Amino acid sequence: LAVKTHVKGDFPKDLVALHNFKGGYCGVSKVENDIINLCYITNFEAFKKFKNIDEFQEKVVFKNKYLNSIFKNSQPVFETPLTIGQISFSSKSPIENHMIMCGDTAGMIHPLCGNGMSMAIRSAQMASQLIINYLQGKIESRIELEKAYQKSWNKEFKTRLKVGHFAANIFSKNQLSEMLVPIIKQIPNLLPKIIKLTHGKPMVVKCAC
């Protein structure tokens, strides 16, 4: 289950915060018009004990003192939060019934990695270039096109998804994350390396002008 809402309140414009709670995590950032974007994700096991979102927030999310302070000291912009259920981070195939999958349809990375949109753009770029090569006769058959895309997709994204899934599992487990955060603080180079594994290399676009 993912829940998103916009609120007005006091929060730095140059900060993106990530806070966890039992069974999930919440991202906080300033967006346009001085609005604070609050978005959290949790699993069904953590949520099913409660009647509604309000009760879940009061009894679970607000156990995190930082989230409690942000929610309680802000004014909602939305009448009701936006929600979406049945989100799947399970493995998918870049090719389905001979159709090329791009973005989340090929594999959805956890939101805490903050890299879903760039993955969608990058996979579309990869698919476009291979399709152009196919239409120009540089790739001889549709089967070769599919194999080339699958190989390129796995090389570009498979590790990112695995690392993102691993990081999300750790972050949604309070005791484990509380134990690991001090360790990460003691090893300054560790966090940038983890982030790099979920983001890959910068995308290069060739100008045809």
Regions found by a protein language model. Give the residues of each.
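Generic recognition of cysteine residues
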Residues: 26, 39, 102, 113, ...
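Short capping/connector residues at structural and topological boundaries
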Residues: 12, 23-26, 30, 36, ...
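C-terminal helical "tail/cap" subdomain of flavin- and related membrane-associated enzymes
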Residues: 132-209
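Glycine-rich, flexible loop/turn motifs
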Residues: 3, 12-17, 67, 80-85, ...
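Conserved FAD-binding catalytic core of PHBH/FMO-like flavoproteins
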Residues: 1-62, 66
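FAD/FMN-dependent oxidoreductases across multiple families
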Residues: 48-131, 136-139
